[in-house]
Amino acid sequence: MALGDLMVSRFSQSSVSLVSNHRYDEDCVSSHDDGDSRRKDSEAKSSSSYGNGTTEGAATATSMAYLPQTIVLCELRHDASEASAPLGTSEIVLVPKWRLKERMKTGCVALVLCLNITVDPPDVIKISPCARIEAWIDPFSMAPPKALETIGKNLSTQYERWQPRARYKVQLDPTVDEVRKLCLTCRKYAKTERVLFHYNGHGVPKPTANGEIWVFNKSYTQYIPLPISELDSWLKTPSIYVFDCSAARMILNAFAELHDWGSSGSSGSSRDCILLAACDVHETLPQSVEFPADVFTSCLTTPIKMALKWFCRRSLLKEIIDESLIDRIPGRQNDRKTLLGELNWIFTAVTDTIAWNVLPHELFQRLFRQDLLVASLFRNFLLAERIMRSANCNPISHPMLPPTHQHHMWDAWDMAAEICLSQLPQLVLDPSTEFQPSPFFTEQLTAFEVWLDHGSEHKKPPEQLPIVLQVLLSQCHRFRALVLLGRFLDMGSWAVDLALSVGIFPYVLKLLQTTTNELRQILVFIWTKILALDKSCQIDLVKDGGHTYFIRFLDSSGAFPEQRAMAAFVLAVIVDGHRRGQEACLEANLIGVCLGHLEASRPSDPQPEPLFLQWLCLCLGKLWEDFMEAQIMGREANAFEKLAPLLSEPQPEVRAAAVFALGTLLDIGFDSNKSVVEDEFDDDEKIRAEDAIIKSLLDVVSDGSPLVRAEVAVALARFAFGHKQHLKLAAASYWKPQSSSLLTSLPSIAKFHDPGSATIVSLHMSPLTRASTDSQPVARESRISSSPLGSSGLMQGSPLSDDSSLHSDSGMMHDSVSNGAVHQPRLLDNAVYSQCVRAMFALAKDPSPRIASLGRRVLSIIGIEQVVAKPSKPTGRPGEAATTSHTPLAGLARSSSWFDMHAGNLPLSFRTPPVSPPRTNYLSGLRRVCSLEFRPHLLGSPDSGLADPLLGASGSERSLLPLSTIYGWSCGHFSKPLLGGADASQEIAAKREEKEKFALEHIAKCQHSSISKLNNNPIANWDTRFETGTKTALLHPFSPIVVAADENERIRVWNYEEATLLNGFDNHDFPDKGISKLCLINELDDSLLLVASCDGSVRIWKNYATKGKQKLVTGFSSIQGHKPGARDLNAVVDWQQQSGYLYASGETSTVTLWDLEKEQLVRSVPSESECGVTALSASQVHGGQLAAGFADGSLRLYDVRSPEPLVCATRPHQKVERVVGLSFQPGLDPAKVVSASQAGDIQFLDLRTTRDTYLTIDAHRGSLTALAVHRHAPIIASGSAKQLIKVFSLQGEQLGIIRYYPSFMAQKIGSVSCLTFHPYQVLLAAGAADSFVSIYTHDNSQAR
């Protein structure tokens, strides 16, 4: 049973349910847990409606087809800003405020009683009768010496109940010297612990105006003053003083003056000096016989007895209860199952609650949690304030407490006391009678539950929190208290911090020692919440053996997957950067338990919980991260074979976690102090494991999720750190001219033009010396010119001897050369290194800025420097964001090789000299190559554009590796609320319902409208100010917004009703530009803007219409590789909301299908053509259907749901010209398409019935540049480079022609570059090469 269900079943009044497994973001309306099945259901419903439009079911299915329910890219991972993702080298560890800096103990208690029985002090006039009881002894009931001794013993016993382990010293009617010896002895014994000094001055005068207290001379004939300064010098700190005498505040004032507590710079010793005083300066102690003479001491040391006696006289029960019965309350104070024990328990809960609610949390922790005896005294001090104020006496403390005597929790205490007293006569009369427990705790838990139902972070915190803590001590209330505590902790990190501050930690830590099955689930949940806030608790857990509790839970058969995921999270935190935790969990077979669960996840098994898989991987990764023994055990347990299949899981979080686990299984590299020869003999099994791991990681280097690719980059950085030399060899091998053909997909860092300074930053490097067959290695150093003209001059250097090592100017690993052989550590296949270098360069030009930054960092690890692009000048204008959307990236130009043939420049520099690649694995007979260096003045130039070397010669090289983010990011899931209903999504659902209603109304209008003519005069005309004209545009379905982009991938958003620019930003900062298409994703919800570039890069933005607030949701490269001989990819894409698929193709032999819900390439469909794809159109009502137009004028229809996806192929266009536009016709017909050729003809086809066209429109005589087909209305539009737009009906009737802008001079429109219809209204947006975007509508529309 799930945790939420468990709570509900146990307490039906607690409406709690657990959120579905890996759905992190409540902002999404529908669950994505079963996207494929939902997709199939949606498609089935839409398919079933063909030919049956009369039934209600068909109408529903039709609306489902037109209004797809699929929502993508709205998980928690898409809310994380690119800029906020950590790339640093160290984590910021926050010191938890709830944890006490140090616990303290009162080690010694000095009791000084100055009673001088039978002699009243001269300044006291006693009433008759007056209070006489001291320590519950009547001093006149026995001989004075005996009475004094008995009182001293009683007082000592009363204190011992609160701190039995302290040493107690009593001085009765002492002299100054005796007090001095007592104090010095106590301090000597206590050492650094606290000393308590209790002073009873009932037999001496009240303190002097200077705060001196009185003691006796040896003969008891005089009162001797004792200065507070001397007392303070003997006891020192830490200390606590109790002064039970009249005018006791005089003493506090003297301490304050002594320590200068009033000044802001007072010493820290004042914090370690605590004082409790019985009354204020002008007050005398109560003399009423209602109270004992030492009422203050009685409150502090015997609170239950004192409280009941005081209450009894004020209760309605006073007539029927004999006060003497209070001394006979059955039970023990420390046994909560007895009446006395329960009363003490309730009293503790009440006073803790009062203190918690009135004191600052720091002061509460200091007084009520740091020292057991101090906590007890301050709880009892609250009672003293209540009782003594009724006698016009005001107890005082330092630190000063606010008034608490009228706090409403005292009413709850009075009720508990009354229930107790009402049972007392019967319990005393018949000891076998069972007492009825007080409903106090049940009622307080109910009050806490009411708060949980209505409270929040922004309301007053629940005052019952300290009571919940107390209830954990009771078996009968424990389960309910834990469930309610779990609900509270789930409200957020603020709630966890509050609970920890109140002192919950030691209680839940001790509960891990219980074996009660009922508590396991909720304890795991509570510890999940605690560790999500504060990982420092890992130390306490390992110290107390708590890790075994969670390993047993993880291995148990009864737990649900989401509960096991929490246990795996707890264990991951325990081993995170904590060697003792790693060792303890390794000994407890955590690796075996985790791998056992991964192995159990076979295809025949039920679909495993993604969150559980994710945390199993993260737990393993953290267990063997930088822990060689665990890595060895992981390899021996075939961890790779069990982790590798997870790289194809549909959830990006699982894939990223699996990459993390595999990456941390890689050894980071040998110690630079370790002998290279020793490293040569590494275990072959380790080499094979590394080889397998790297090959598996290279398979996901092009994953659709930045979360996954970031982990691949981090893993490759770890690999690069241990294999720097071999990767440099692989990089150097590509410098050979004959190797350039292998690099068709690798980028080059060419000269980058900075428009701001009109300078060119370029790197000039000399050619690489070819490896020679000469048996004797020879090396020459060559230096090269840094002339801005690019002329390279060779400077002869001194030759290096055979056995000299290559020096690294940045402290990289040295080659070890002896006898002509270079020893290389852990050698893998050369092809693996080559593939790694290609992968690193692919990452360095990643569409995601964060991944690109990581990729450049990996390249820096192997010594490859980069040219950094300077930020271009802001091109914004008033009303739009003038800054670029993210940090400028390195200028990684995409070209066919690393050579920049102009001026003979090589684009890369190695900080350490690259070596020619070996011909065999035994690297003998290598010729050393030239050392390539820059001139010092170039390196020192601020405008050189060179990145600083990442790795220096110091021992901190390893700390400079980029950090993984998946673990820290995943931890955030458990910081968020995991329990609760769907209230948060109701508002979102209402907004969607409103949009659906609007869409259905307008779809019906479009379908049943008769459009006679399109108005030549636009309703809006927008000068985009694009320098290269508008390349593509789209109209927002629910707002008067048009989004346009130019060839330089500058995006601008315009409100055409208000004629205002809303936002403008650059899609990216790479030098190569080219836009392919704009699409809207999730248009019925919070829409996202998909921007596809000509090179196949896809970037998806949120908040795109808000000035300066645009945020990159995700980015990936939709196409890998292109056809031989093709210079550019010329990517074309289309988005299908119904299936959640993005289709992409271009100068490539396949059409790739990306599932944006999984962020994964799910299929590559062969295009079945030698020509490149020039147009793509996905059906918006039939998921999986796709039409493609080719460069030779041919068309193909695919159904990607079928094993044989090609449905049919035809060539409707007579001339061999590329297909410019292609679209499915409006309606639910699955195979009617419209195709437009560059030659100017538009063909209408029904590909399911015949491959021939049933209608041809010769729209333009050549130069057709754009086609738009309305999604629902029977209208199409075409545009020409010859500056005109034509509009037609689906029957071929021309509805309009547009040639001129509406101006006095009748200026012709520009060469048409793009056309797009509004999806639900008859609006046409047209973009042209002259930077104008115009919006047209039809003249009249009437219902048929």
UniProtKB/Swiss-Prot annotation:
Region Disordered: start-end pairs: 28-56, 771-818
Consequences of knocking out this gene: Embryonic lethality when homozygous. Embryo development arrested at very early stage (early pre-globular stage), leading to aborted shrunken seeds. Constitutive autophagy.
Pfam families the UniProt entry points to: Raptor_N, WD40
Start-end of Basic and acidic residues biased regions: 28-44
Keywords: Cytoplasm, Developmental protein, Growth regulation, Repeat, WD repeat
Predominant cellular place of this UniProt entry's protein: cytoplasm
Listed GO MF terms: kinase binding
Top-level taxonomic group: Eukaryota
Expression sites by tissue: Expressed in roots, leaves, flowers and seeds.
Posttranslational modification: Phosphorylated by KIN10.
Record InterPro entries: ARM-like, ARM-type_fold, Raptor, Raptor_N, WD40/YVTN_repeat-like_dom_sf, WD40_repeat_dom_sf, WD40_rpt
Composition bias type Low complexity, residue spans: 785-816
SUPFAM superfamilies referenced in this protein's UniProt entry, alphabetically: ARM repeat, WD40 repeat-like
Record-level GO BP terms: embryo development ending in seed dormancy; maintenance of shoot apical meristem identity; negative regulation of autophagy; TOR signaling
Cellular-component GO terms for this entry: Cul4-RING E3 ubiquitin ligase complex; cytoplasm; TORC1 complex
Subcellular compartments: Cytoplasm
Extent of the WD repeats: 1025-1064, 1070-1111, 1125-1164, 1168-1208, 1214-1255, 1259-1298, 1307-1344
Function (record text): Probable component of the plant TOR kinase pathway that recruits substrates for TOR. Modulates plant cell growth and regulates the activity of ATPK1 kinase in response to osmotic stress.
PANTHER family for this protein: REGULATORY-ASSOCIATED PROTEIN OF MTOR
Similarity comment text for this entry: Belongs to the WD repeat RAPTOR family.
Quaternary data: Interacts with TOR, ATPK1 and ML1. Interacts with KIN10.
Record-given protein name: Regulatory-associated protein of TOR 1
Organism from which the protein derives: Arabidopsis thaliana (Mouse-ear cress)
Gene: RAPTOR1
